[in-house]
Curated annotation (Swiss-Prot):
Keywords, in A-Z order: ATP synthesis, Cell inner membrane, Cell membrane, CF(1), Hydrogen ion transport, Ion transport, Membrane, Transport
UniProt similarity note: Belongs to the ATPase delta chain family.
UniProt-annotated location(s): Cell inner membrane
PANTHER family the UniProt entry points to: ATP SYNTHASE DELTA CHAIN
Protein name, per record: ATP synthase subunit delta
Length: 180
């Protein structure tokens, strides 16, 4: 089974448990925090990946981290389970998948809006409102400036791209002119 499939299984199960406990958001925050710690600390990742350290040593390190970060029993149990099964390295993907499932459950989308020039707050809000109206979901928009677009905007929602950039329009015109 692929790492991505494994991550999705753990994430989906945890979202279901979080939903039942009313803790979806807090679980997400805890997973994100621990995942960032694991990703940012090479030494910590090395300890968990190194077979020279026994499982008991790894458990002790995990218990200390869980206590220091004040993680919930559910997340603590998940981390211990991943440690026992040698899958702690999958945690960043579990965290990412969990976030996606949690957003789906709560009706949130997180599109990326790229523009050639910085947009005014009113323009961003207008786009956010239009996306919310067309999708029927809460929109948490990530705004980026990409000078290569020249002008216009590109919106990415999941796997879909809505490209209204000047760069793309110029490329289309060039293509039409070349084809005759």
């Amino acid at each position: 089974m692929s790492t991505n499939a494994i991550a999705k299984r753990y994430a989906k199960a945890l979202v279901q448990l979080g939903s039942e406990a009313g803790s979806v958001d807090s679980f997400n925050a805890e997973l994100t925090r621990f995942s960032a710690l694991l990703t940012d600390s090479r030494d910590l990742s090395a300890v968990f990946a190194n077979p020279a350290y026994g499982i008991e040593s790894k458990r002790e390190v995990m218990k200390e981290l869980v206590a220091k970060l004040q993680l919930s029993p559910m997340i603590s149990n998940l981390l211990m389970l991943l440690l026992e099964r040698g899958r702690i390295s999958v945690l960043p993907q579990i965290s990412e998948s969990y976030g996606a499932f949690a957003d789906e459950l709560s009706g949130v989308i997180r599109p990326t809006l790229s523009s050639g020039l910085p947009l005014e707050a009113s323009q961003i809000e207008e786009i956010r409102s239009a996306l919310a109206k067309s999708t029927g979901k809460k929109v948490e928009l990530k705004v980026e400036v990409d000078p290569s677009l020249i002008g216009g905007v590109v919106t990415k929602i999941g796997g879909k791209v809505f490209d209204g950039s000047v760069r793309t329009q110029l490329a289309r015109i060039q293509d039409i002119l070349q084809k005759g």
